[in-house]
Amino acid sequence: MRFTPYLVLAPTAAVAFAQLFDPLHRTASDIQQQSQSQSVNHAQIPLAKPAVGLGPAMPPSGAPQADGPANAGGGSSVMLSDVMGRDKSINLFAGFLRSIESPSQRLDDPARNTTVLAPLNSAIENLPRKPWEDPRDYSALGANAYEGEDGQGRAQRNLRRFVEAHLIPTSPWPAGEKIKPVGGDTEVWWEEKDGVKRIQPGDIEVLNVGSSVVNGEVWILKGVRNAS
């Protein structure tokens, strides 16, 4: 299975989208139960309307699917796009990634190796703000910064920056090698301390290497990179 990119359409689809998937207002187990009980609607969906009292909601355009191959590595035809939905512990980030066209296409490209730094669901849920929110937007535009068509576009750009900050454009990625993420912000590297990989800057612990396939690896993180 390959990732299918999703783009924002008219606001009339917001209700259907809100019923399908709102990752930061629902638990990961709720998302998984729904993804098992119904097929993902492949129509392109816009940002959801904000829920009262909870701030703007702009989840990705479909629930991540945990239906990758049983064997995540070894086969020359298996891509990162095949395995991103396998691990339920990172399905929030997988959903964000598949909602952005360019990053999702990259994971389906055998010519572009990538190390995916995928934060745990719990790390994303514990953020002080949602991944598509930027305090600078609120400062400049107020509480309605993510309302309307312009707001949806603004949130989508912020979410893309968040996702791309977690994509390293190389694999294998040697210890100590400094490289800019796909998003092009400050250089990132990793080092091993007491047998544990840690992403720098930020000293973010790597829980494990979840998958290793022909065009890269998925590293599961206990924390989230700062995409600002």
Swiss-Prot record:
UniProt KW Repressor keyword: no
Keyword terms, alphabetized: Signal, Vacuole
Chief localization: other
Subcellular location: Vacuole
Organism superkingdom: Eukaryota
Segment forming the signal sequence: 1-18
Region (Disordered): 50-74
GO CC aspect terms: vacuole
Keyword set includes Signal: yes
InterPro entries: FAS1_dom_sf (IPR036378), Mug57-like (IPR040200)
Residue span, FAS1 domain: 77-225
Protein name: FAS1 domain-containing protein NCU02579
